[in-house]
A protein has these predicted regions:
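Metal-centered catalytic cores of metalloenzymes
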Residues: 1-78
Length: 78
């Protein structure tokens, strides 16, 4: 298991996401951003918009995805 923070994934805070794969932490980040914005946390709004943009434009979003996967792979196990 490895840990990445919201900030490491492009968000504004240091909330830790844990997972066995990069996809696990990316999914946790997506849920965190949606929850934070739903609770009127304006600081997370730009990151949520960026995330939605990656889903709407998957080819251009692949650069972010590949970087997140590389960053995750480089992390030590918890």
């Amino acid at each position: 298991m490895k840990t990445m923070t919201c900030k490491q994934l492009g968000g504004p805070c240091d909330l830790a996401h844990h997972g066995d794969t990069a996809d696990d932490v990316i999914k946790a980040q997506d849920a965190h951003l949606r929850d934070a914005v739903a609770q009127a946390d304006a600081a997370h709004d730009p990151a949520l918009k960026d995330m939605k943009g990656r889903w709407k434009h998957p080819i251009s979003g692949m650069g972010w995805y590949r970087k997140a996967k590389r960053d995750f792979a480089a992390l030590p196990e918890d």
